[in-house]
Curated annotation (Swiss-Prot):
PROSITE patterns: SAM_MT_TRMB. The gene is trmB. Pathway: tRNA modification; N(7)-methylguanine-tRNA biosynthesis. Substrate binds at K147, D179, T216, R217, Y218, E219. This is tRNA (guanine-N(7)-)-methyltransferase. It is an enzyme of class 2 (transferase).
């Protein structure tokens, strides 16, 4: 197990972040959402040694808490929140344009009761979460960092899987998707090798994917022209 798994309550050192935090200039409405709605939904960066109880981030009782790493435009997370009002959804994203997009969905669909946003690197939040506190984690179409010299920037890694294994409940799900063949092979190798995870599904057949797995905008646009591969792994019983 990695050091984060062994010491889940250790203070998270701020990791180096690679990627954009802002794209095109935000329009007035989007800026208004960032200024007015985001503060009401934000999960603060934990203090050293702070524990963050995910279920207590929501105003009402939730049956489970699910977390999405890098939610992009927020379509997937918003659909899950709408379909599962008794589930708390935490979306982690640093890209302000994507955050504004999710906030638009939250406002239009009135999802403020079961959506929370961590607008920072998810690696700052995960160490503060208690063992077995999440029911599902989603890592959908992360930056593949296809060059070999950038392999250490890929989110799926033995160390990250240690952390996810710690915070997922027994039987909890890790859902991963990518359309980059290098990342697909990388993710499959590390997921298959990790003793805490059991493979349930690995397919490029969208019809074989569970019905409660909404498509992301990236997937719908099919930017690369390559068929995505979908992985579903289950956290083995402790």
């Amino acid at each position: 197990m990695g050091k984060h798994a062994e010491n889940g309550n250790a203070a998270a050192e701020r990791p180096r972040f690679f990627g954009r935090r802002q794209g095109k200039a935000l329009r007035r409405n989007a800026l208004g959402l960032i200024e007015d709605l985001l503060p009401r939904l934000t999960v603060a960066v934990p203090e050293p040694d702070e524990r963050v109880e995910p279920a207590l981030l929501f105003p009402g009782a939730v049956r489970s808490v699910w977390l999405e790493v890098g939610f992009g435009g927020g379509e997937h997370l918003a659909q899950l929140a709408e379909d599962n009002p008794d589930i708390g959804l935490i979306g982690c994203e640093v890209f302000r344009n994507g955050i504004a997009s999710l906030l638009g969905h939250v406002q239009a669909r009135q999802l403020g009761n079961n959506v929370r946003v961590f607008p920072e690197d998810v690696r700052l939040l995960l160490p503060a979460l208690p063992d077995g506190s999440l029911g599902r984690v989603f890592v959908l179409f992360p930056d593949p960092w296809p060059k070999t010299r950038h392999a250490d920037r890929r989110f799926i890694s033995p160390e990250t899987l240690d952390v996810l294994a710690r915070v997922l409940e027994s039987g909890g799900e890790l859902r991963v998707a990518s359309d980059d063949p290098i990342y697909v092979a990388w993710a499959a190798r590390h997921l298959d090798a990790h003793p805490a995870f059991e493979k349930i599904l690995a397919t490029a057949d969208r019809s074989a994917v569970p019905a409660d797995w909404p498509a992301t905008r990236y997937e719908q646009k099919c930017i690369t022209g390559r068929a995505p591969v979908f992985f579903l792994y289950r956290r083995r019983a402790r």
